[in-house]
Amino acid sequence: MEACPHIRYAFQNDKLLLQQASVGRLTLVNKTTILLRPMKTTTVDLGLYARPPEGHGLMLWGSTSRPVTSHVGIIDPGYTGELRLILQNQRRYNSTLRPSELKIHLAAFRYATPQMEEDKGPINHPQYPGDVGLDVSLPKDLALFPHQTVSVTLTVPPPSIPHHRPTIFGRSGLAMQGILVKPCRWRRGGVDVSLTNFSDQTVFLNKYRRFCQLVYLHKHHLTSFYSPHSDAGVIGPRSLFRWASCAFEEVPGLAMGDSGLSEALEGRQGRGFGSSGQ
């Protein structure tokens, strides 16, 4: 019988409660009030450090019934810094998350990376070696006005990998500027990538800029049937995200840089939020 992979983590935060660290998903809940101002990015320092098992990446997202949108972050194996959640206020006035109104989830997934000798259209090699996702660049210049949603159409079919599904995720660098990308499947006929500007400024993105990332999730992680080990709030109701069966192992030394893996994967370390550099 195959041993259950372990996610190593360290956590210490007086403002968050570790509600659950069961097989597959770790959940934190806010113990204090979080104020989100209109058209301003809010970051929540989690006091959480995590390392995925070999062959896995980590996914970080938030859920709430309040009018607040969370950036879905892809945590690369080489990232060694503190995890932080990026939130955007959907309203044009203050929103308040009272205690227990925000749940923060961390889960693992299996992935693969296609072998590309050269860049293929808008699909580029990642900035850091060992990153989970491929970089995807804009095919044209783009302007997003405050609270505007724009779709970018990509018609080039992505490289195929057996038993894996190409999926689009946003970048933390753009999310910090108020631009959130809605995760979605990239199918053979192309994909329409949806970007929303939650900031109070018009944001100009130049052609060829990295604006999202392409992650090849193992097909096991995408399902149309709900289960206690899946979440419809990550990718959407048509493709529920089902996390990998991993056990969480608390290793306090991770917060002090005792990562092991970080020594093997040089280059990223604490840069970015785990899903991109800034």
From Swiss-Prot:
Keywords linked to the UniProt accession: Hydrolase, Magnesium, Metal-binding, Nucleotide metabolism
Reaction(s) this enzyme catalyzes, per UniProt: dUTP + H2O = dUMP + diphosphate + H(+)
E.C. numbers: 3.6.1.23
SUPFAM superfamilies linked to this entry: dUTPase-like (SSF51283)
Any single GO BP term: dUTP metabolic process
Cofactor(s) named in the record: Mg(2+)
Enzyme class: hydrolase
Molecular function terms, GO-annotated: dUTP diphosphatase activity; metal ion binding
Binding site for substrate: R171, S172, G173, F273, G274
Membership in a protein family: Belongs to the dUTPase family.
HAMAP family in the cross-refs: HSV_DUT
Function, as annotated: Involved in nucleotide metabolism: produces dUMP, the immediate precursor of thymidine nucleotides and decreases the intracellular concentration of dUTP to avoid uracil incorporation into viral DNA.
Name the UniProt record assigns to this protein: Deoxyuridine 5'-triphosphate nucleotidohydrolase
Organism: Epstein-Barr virus (strain GD1) (HHV-4)
This protein's encoding gene: DUT
